C-alpha cells in the first residue's frame, strides 16, 4: 500500500499528528555542515586534509565524514565576492556532483547577520518598506534562479539568518516593527516558492534552549500572516553557558529538545538544527556533546527534528567552535560519521 495513504489513514483514525508524525515523516535524517567559507580558504592557499593527512576538497571531505547535505550563506553585495550568489553557485555545483542536498541561507545583508546585527545592504539603505520587500524578493529570486538554471536542486531556503530580533534594521526590527518583519519574511517566502515550489522555507532563530524568544517571533509572524514551513534553530552550549542561559551543556541539550517538541506542536511545523558547534580546544568532550545533540535531535523530539548542521567546522584560529586542527578534522567530526552509520 502507498505509504502516503497509510499515513493519511492513520492521521484520520488517530486524529493527532503527533501520534504518528514521526513514523510518517521521510526517513532521512540530515547531517551536514555550513562550509560557506571554503572558497575563501582556497583563495588564501589553504589545503584541507582528512584525518589521515590526505588532501581533500572540503565538500568531498564532508561527505567522506558521513554528511548528506551542506548549507551555504548568501550575502547581497559582499565586497570581496565571497558568499555572493556566484560564489554560492560554485559550492552548490560541488555538492550536486557529490549527490548532497543543499540549504541556502539568505542573510539579506552585505555581510554577517545575526541577533546582534542585521544591517540593510548598502544598495537598499534608502528604500521604503514596499521597495524593501521588492528588493528582498528580487534578490531571493535572482539567486535561486541562477542555481536552478544550472541544474541545482535546493531543498531548503532560510529567509534570514538568526532573525531573533528581526532583520533589515531598523525597518524590520521585530521588537518595534513586527508587522514589517512579518511582511518582509513573507515576501521572501513567496519569492522562494516562485522558483522552487517544493523547497522548505525556514525561519531561523538562535538559542534553541530559550522558549520565550521563539514564542515572541513565531506568535508575531502568525499574527501578521507570514508563512514559513519549518523552524530552524541554533544549538550552541558554549554560547548558552556564556550568556548564563544554562549551567552546563547537559541543560542545553535537554532544553533545546523540549523546546523543539513544544514548538513543533504549537506551530504545526517541523524543525531542524541548522547551526551547532562545540569547543575546538576540547575535542574529546566536544565529540561527546555533539553526539548528544545529534541523539537528542533525532530521538527526543517526537520525530519532528530533521537534521543537524555544524557551522564552519573547518574554521580555525580565533573562532572557538570549529572542529579542525591544522586543517584536518578532529575527533569531534567522528560524531557525524558514527551518526551516519546508525540505522534509521
Residue ranges, per PLM feature:
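Boundary/entry segment of secreted carbohydrate-active catalytic domains
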Residues: 25-58
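Bacterial N-terminal signal peptides that target proteins for export
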Residues: 1-10
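Bacterial N-terminal signal peptides
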Residues: 9-18
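Hydrophobic faces of well-ordered beta-strands that scaffold small-molecule active sites
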Residues: 31-33, 70-72, 102-106, 155-159, ...
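Aromatic-rich peripheral "rim/lid" segments of glycoside hydrolase catalytic domains that contact
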Residues: 43-47, 112, 262, 280-292, ...
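Active-site cleft segment of glycoside hydrolase catalytic domains centered on the general acid/base Glu
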Residues: 84-87, 114-221, 226-228, 240-258, ...
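Active-site beta-loop-alpha junctions enriched in small/polar residues
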Residues: 36-38, 75-77, 107-109, 159-164, ...
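Aromatic-lined substrate-binding rim segments of carbohydrate-active enzymes
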Residues: 54-113, 175-198, 249-254, 258, ...
Amino acid at each position: 500500500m502507498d505509504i502516503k495513504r497509510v499515513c493519511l489513514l492513520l492521521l484520520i483514525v488517530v486524529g493527532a499528528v503527533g501520534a504518528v508524525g514521526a513514523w510518517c515523516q521521510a526517513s532521512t535524517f540530515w547531517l551536514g555542515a555550513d562550509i560557506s567559507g571554503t572558497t575563501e580558504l582556497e583563495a588564501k592557499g589553504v589545503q584541507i586534509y582528512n584525518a589521515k593527512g590526505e588532501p581533500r576538497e572540503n565538500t568531498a571531505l564532508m561527505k567522506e565524514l558521513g554528511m548528506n547535505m551542506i548549507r551555504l550563506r548568501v550575502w547581497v553585495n559582499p565586497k570581496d565576492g565571497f558568499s555572493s550568489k556566484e560564489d554560492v553557485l560554485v559550492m552548490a555545483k560541488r555538492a550536486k556532483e557529490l549527490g548532497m542536498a543543499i540549504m541556502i541561507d539568505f542573510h539579506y545583508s552585505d555581510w554577517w547577520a545575526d541577533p546582534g546585527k542585521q544591517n540593510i545592504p548598502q544598495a537598499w539603505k534608502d528604500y521604503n518598506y514596499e521597495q524593501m520587500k521588492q528588493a528582498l524578493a528580487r534578490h531571493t529570486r535572482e539567486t535561486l534562479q541562477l542555481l536552478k538554471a544550472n541544474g541545482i536542486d535546493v531543498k531548503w531556503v532560510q529567509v534570514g539568518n538568526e532573525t531573533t530580533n528581526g532583520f533589515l534594521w531598523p525597518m524590520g526590527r521585530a521588537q518595534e516593527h513586527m508587522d514589517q518583519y512579518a511582511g518582509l519574511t513573507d515576501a521572501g517566502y513567496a519569492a522562494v516558492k516562485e522558483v522552487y515550489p517544493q523547497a522548505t522555507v525556514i525561519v531561523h532563530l538562535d538559542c534553541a534552549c530559550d522558549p520565550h524568544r521563539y514564542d515572541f517571533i513565531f506568535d508575531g509572524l502568525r499574527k501578521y500572516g507570514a508563512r514559513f514551513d519549518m523552524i530552524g534553530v541554533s544549538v550552541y552550549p558554549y554560547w548558552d553557558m556564556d550568556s548564563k542561559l544554562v549551567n552546563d551543556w547537559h541543560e542545553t541539550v535537554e532544553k533545546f529538545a523540549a523546546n523543539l517538541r513544544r514548538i513543533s506542536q504549537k506551530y504545526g511545523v517541523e524543525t531542524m538544527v541548522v547551526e551547532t558547534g562545540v569547543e575546538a580546544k576540547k575535542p574529546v568532550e566536544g565529540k561527546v556533546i555533539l553526539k548528544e545533540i545529534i541523539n537528542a535531535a533525532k530521538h527526543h523530539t517526537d520525530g519532528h527534528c530533521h537534521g543537524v548542521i555544524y557551522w564552519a567546522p573547518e574554521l580555525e584560529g580565533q573562532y572557538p567552535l570549529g572542529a579542525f586542527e591544522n586543517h584536518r578534522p578532529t575527533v569531534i567530526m567522528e560524531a557525524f560519521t558514527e551518526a551516519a552509520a546508525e540505522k534509521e
